[in-house]
Curated annotation (Swiss-Prot):
This is Ribosome-binding factor A. GO terms for biological process: maturation of SSU-rRNA. The gene is rbfA. The keyword Cytoplasm applies. It is found in: Cytoplasm. The keyword Cytoplasm applies.
Amino acid sequence: MADPARAGRLAQRIKVLVAEALRRGVKDDRVEPVTVTEVRVTNDLQHATVYYTVLGDEATVAAAHEGIQDNRGILRREVGRGLTIRLVPTLEFVADTVPEAAAHLEDVLRAAKERDAELAKAREGASYAGDADPYRTAEPDADDAPRA
């Protein structure tokens, strides 16, 4: 078991190394639009999950995924050269869906805000259906009379 702080530092270093390797070390045009967003390392430092996003349409995303899978060995070699640990962790690349989920959440919040504005506009001219308090009467009830 490694110290969680050490695992965090290692994950940050792997993130930088993978990003640099994608930019300089890999001679594949398919991986140009790839951005590394996060790296998570297991507690035993043997496995690293690299999350990435791709700017572009579905064809670009699919091509980038294939490019990353084809160059996984080169990326691991570059990470191994940049780290000073005995065993280089295996790298697993996962497409990050957080930006799409955030965009969807923003759309839902925008729709809710528009609906709230519509309801507020409808509420402006509205009035109560009856008196202010339909249960209040002018004469006191027998139950409300003071006891002697």
